[in-house]
Design a protein with these regions (language model features):
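N-terminal helix-turn-helix
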Residues: 1-80
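Amphipathic alpha-helical effector-binding/dimerization core
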Residues: 74-129
Length: 129
């Protein structure tokens, strides 16, 4: 991450922790602290701060990303009028071709999938969209 005088260090630390957790089933405070070269107390404070918002879930001594993030993602996705407009066309195209159909939008130069439909011949995966 770029460090400038306008950045908030604690927010950057939290984002670094969340990025570390992404793609992992769960992490312990110690594992996260050691990997990111942070104090255990720092990791604990950050995770505790977002636990009530369901952004992380604590199960014993382990933490995982929570479904609270999903509600933010769905809210953002629903801001795109094309999401609702494309549903019927995506279903029809998936039925006609038997293939997986993706609806993607551009954001900051990146292609972001916001919906998908699986045809009868599509290989299924576990992503949400």
């Amino acid at each position: 991450m770029e460090h400038t005088s306008t950045r908030i260090k604690s927010v950057e630390t939290l984002l670094t922790i969340l990025e570390f957790m992404k793609g992992r089933e769960s992490v312990t405070i110690t594992e996260c602290a050691e990997e990111l070269d942070l104090a255990n107390s720092t990791v604990h404070k950050h995770l505790s701060s977002i636990k009530d918002a369901r952004l992380v879930v604590q199960e014993g001594t382990e933490y995982r990303l929570g479904l609270g993030f999903l509600t933010y993602g769905i809210a953002v996705r629903n801001l795109f009028p094309i999401y609702d407009l494309a549903q019927d066309a995506m279903d029809e195209l998936a039925d006609e071709t038997g293939e997986r159909i993706w609806l993607k939008v551009e954001e900051n130069g990146f292609e972001i999938p916001i919906a998908k439909r699986g045809g009868q011949h599509a290989i299924h995966d576990h992503d949400i969209g």
